[in-house]
Design a protein with these regions (language model features):
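Phosphate/NTP-binding elements of NTP-utilizing enzymes
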Residues: 45
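Short acidic-hydrophobic, aromatic-tinged amphipathic segments that line or gate anion-handling sites
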Residues: 74-75, 125-128
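Active-site neighborhoods of divalent-metal-dependent phosphate/nucleic-acid chemistry enzymes
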Residues: 57, 68-115
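Short, well-structured N-terminal submotif of metal-dependent ribonuclease cores
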Residues: 1-37, 51-64, 106, 115-116, ...
């Protein structure tokens, strides 16, 4: 499978793997799966750090390089931006819209714990349950 991790799943996989369901931990460790990450998640993590909601240790560019090293980088294209605007999400969070649209356009499975994204129906998802 080609798995696009949402921001929380990515951060939990790095620092709090116990928050991930066992089946999800297995999928993330399965070498047959491709793990993808959007730069939107990096942006969101840096915003959370700046607001004091999470702590990222050390030099931020170095942290980003290490935290993203094992992931394929999902592009943010005009096609994805248009798809994000057209998604029928119940809230205007741009990060969630971009992640869902990225999964939709690139044919990736979005790994998330967000019920709003899990209930979208227009994209393949893998739940953290």
């Amino acid at each position: 499978m080609k798995l696009l991790l949402d921001t929380h799943i990515w951060l939990w996989s790095l620092g709090e793997p116990a928050r991930l369901a066992r089946h999800l931990q297995r999928e993330l460790q399965n070498d047959e799966n491709e793990l993808w990450l959007s730069p939107v998640s990096t942006w969101e993590a840096l915003l959370l750090h700046a607001k004091g909601r999470i702590r990222l240790h050390g030099d931020l560019p170095k942290w980003v390089a290490q935290a993203t090293a094992h992931f394929r980088e999902a592009p943010l294209t005009h096609e994805i931006v248009i798809a994000a605007q057209q998604l029928p999400l119940s809230h205007p969070d741009p990060a969630d819209r971009f992640l869902a649209a990225t999964a939709q356009v690139l044919g990736l499975t979005l790994v998330t714990a967000d019920e709003r994204l899990l209930g979208l129906g227009k994209i393949a998802t893998l739940a953290n349950r």
